[in-house]
């Protein structure tokens, strides 16, 4: 019986390290990709090889995103992400991230959004050792605005 508890304890410790690694990897990816967008006025393609489904903060119907991503280019992009929480569903395979995205932006060929303030939920899958987005839901927070984009075209 003592041996059983040692094994059980060992599994619990190893599992917690796996989960902690996933959490930190995804948080870092969200922060790094946001910093890239702020510096380059364009987004990083982090979509799954299967593409993704998204609800955008501008409202409207669900958007189907190709694996190549969506062409997000901005005249300016000044967004901060904060309060990132990650829930690991299956260690090293699937997780959900939730966070806030706040600032201002002007997507190319769309109106400026001066008080962008949204809640973000994203489902991630691990593909060949890299976390990729499979689904996203962006919803505006009361007092803020969502994006002015309404189409992938």
State each model region's role.
Residues 2-10:
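Sec-dependent signal peptide recognition
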Residues 11-46, 147-153:
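Short, low-complexity N-terminal intrinsically disordered segments enriched in polar/charged residues
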Residues 30, 34-41, 48-51, 56, ...:
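Sec/Tat-exported extracytoplasmic proteins
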Residues 37, 47-63, 72-76, 108:
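A short gly/proline-enriched turn/hairpin at secondary-structure junctions
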Residues 52, 60-61, 102-105, 139-142:
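Solvent-exposed loop/turn segments at secondary-structure junctions
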Residues 67-110:
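Surface-exposed, charged secondary-structure patches
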Residues 117-145:
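Short beta-strand edge/turn micro-motifs at domain boundaries
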């Amino acid at each position: 019986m003592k041996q059983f508890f040692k094994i059980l304890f060992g599994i619990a410790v190893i599992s917690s390290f796996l989960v902690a690694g996933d959490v930190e990897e995804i948080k870092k990816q969200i922060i790094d990709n946001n910093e890239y967008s702020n510096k380059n006025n364009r987004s990083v393609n982090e979509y799954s090889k299967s593409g993704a489904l998204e609800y955008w903060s501008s409202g409207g119907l669900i958007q189907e995103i190709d694996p190549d991503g969506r062409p997000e280019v901005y005249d300016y992009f000044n967004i901060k992400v904060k309060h990132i929480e990650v829930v690991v569903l299956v260690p090293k395979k699937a997780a959900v991230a939730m966070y806030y995205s706040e600032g201002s932006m002007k997507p190319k060929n769309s109106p400026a959004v001066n008080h962008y303030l949204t809640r973000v939920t994203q489902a991630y899958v691990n593909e060949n050792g890299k976390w990729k987005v499979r689904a996203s839901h962006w919803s505006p927070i009361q007092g803020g605005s969502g994006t002015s984009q309404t189409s992938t075209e």
